[in-house]
C-alpha cells in the first residue's frame, strides 16, 4: 500500500464531513462521512489521520444523535409516545457517547409517564440518576417522578442494571 492512502481516505471522508447538513435535512452526507472515517480508522488505526478521524466521528455521531432527538421530540409533542420512545432508545443504542444521552433518558421518562408505564419511567429515572447524577436532567427527572407521585422505593436495582457501560443495546428492547 502507498503511504498516502490514509491521507487520501481522510480527504475523502472530510469532504463529506464538511458538507454535513443541518439536522433538519437528509443526512446521507453525514452517514457517508461516518462510513468513510470508520473505514480509515479500521484500516489504518496507527496513522496520524486516525486520531483526527476519531474526533470527526464523535462530532458526526453527536450530530446524528441530535437529529434523532429532534425527531423524537416532535413525535412526543404530537402525542406519538411509542414512536418517540423508539427514537430516544435508538440514541441510547447507536450513540452511546453522545451528549444527548441524558436528555434522551429524561424524555423516555416523560413518555413512559404519559403512557402510564410507571415501572419503565422509574427504571429510566434510576439509570439517569446513576449515570448522570449532577445534571439538570437528573434534577428535572427527580422532580417529574415526585410530581407524578411515583413510589421511589418501587424496586432496588443492581449496579449492572443501571450502568450504561454494562447495558447492551438489546437490553433497551426489554424495558
What is the role of each PLM region?
Residues 1-175:
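Acidic, polar-rich low-complexity tracts and alpha-helical solenoid repeat scaffolds
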Amino acid at each position: 500500500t502507498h503511504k498516502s492512502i490514509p491521507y487520501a481516505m481522510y480527504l475523502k471522508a472530510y469532504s463529506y464531513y464538511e458538507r454535513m447538513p443541518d439536522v433538519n435535512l437528509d443526512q446521507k452526507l453525514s452517514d457517508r462521512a461516518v462510513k468513510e472515517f470508520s473505514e480509515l480508522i479500521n484500516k489504518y488505526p496507527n496513522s496520524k489521520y486516525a486520531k483526527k478521524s476519531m474526533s470527526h466521528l464523535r462530532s458526526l455521531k453527536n450530530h446524528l444523535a441530535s437529529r434523532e432527538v429532534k425527531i423524537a421530540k416532535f413525535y412526543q409533542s404530537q402525542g406519538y409516545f411509542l414512536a418517540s420512545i423508539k427514537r430516544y432508545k435508538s440514541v441510547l443504542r447507536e450513540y452511546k457517547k453522545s451528549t444527548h444521552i441524558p436528555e434522551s433518558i429524561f424524555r423516555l421518562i416523560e413518555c413512559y409517564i404519559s403512557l402510564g408505564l410507571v415501572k419503565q419511567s422509574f427504571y429510566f429515572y434510576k439509570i439517569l440518576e446513576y449515570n448522570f447524577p449532577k445534571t439538570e436532567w437528573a434534577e428535572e427527572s427527580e422532580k417529574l417522578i415526585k410530581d407524578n407521585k411515583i413510589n421511589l422505593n418501587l424496586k432496588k436495582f443492581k449496579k449492572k442494571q443501571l450502568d450504561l457501560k454494562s447495558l447492551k443495546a438489546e437490553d433497551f428492547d426489554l424495558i
